[in-house]
């Protein structure tokens, strides 16, 4: 199975799930030169999120994904996926919740994107918590 076929299938699966329960937020995080750089930034993003906003969950890792689990209680999780497309890492973020609090899911997604963007800008600063 090619990466493109896998991602297409994943996209269809996410769209089908979105139609059933609006518990998903998917964000394109741009592109990076290597998967290694993508994975490093993904892990740093999840670690920075926990440092600022808390969350007693765990971080799962595979060859090309980083999962931040229990980012808001045990109902909001996030995956940063680092596939290779046309020779570049093409990361995207999926945040999902298992309850009906879609606003909380959206807030977690925004915070993760902000941290990711700050890393790409070379800022290195961790955002301060805002309510």
Predicted region positions:
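Bacterial N-terminal signal peptides that target proteins for export
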Residues: 1-10
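N-terminal signal peptide c-region/cleavage motif recognized by signal peptidases
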Residues: 16-18
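Ser/Thr-rich, low-complexity intrinsically disordered terminal regions
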Residues: 22-27, 31, 35-125, 129-130
């Amino acid at each position: 199975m090619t990466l493109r076929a896998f991602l297409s299938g994943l996209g269809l699966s996410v769209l089908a799930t979105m139609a059933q329960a609006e518990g998903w937020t998917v964000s394109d995080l741009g592109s990076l030169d290597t998967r290694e750089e993508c994975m490093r930034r993904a892990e740093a993003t999840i670690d920075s999120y926990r440092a600022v906003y808390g969350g007693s969950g765990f971080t799962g890792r595979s060859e090309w994904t980083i999962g931040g689990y229990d980012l808001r209680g045990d109902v909001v999780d996030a995956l940063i996926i680092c596939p290779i497309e046309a020779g570049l890492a093409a990361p995207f973020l999926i945040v999902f919740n298992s309850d009906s609090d879609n606003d909380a899911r959206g807030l977690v997604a925004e915070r993760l994107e902000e941290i990711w963007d700050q890393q790409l800008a070379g800022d290195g600063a961790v955002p301060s918590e805002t309510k």
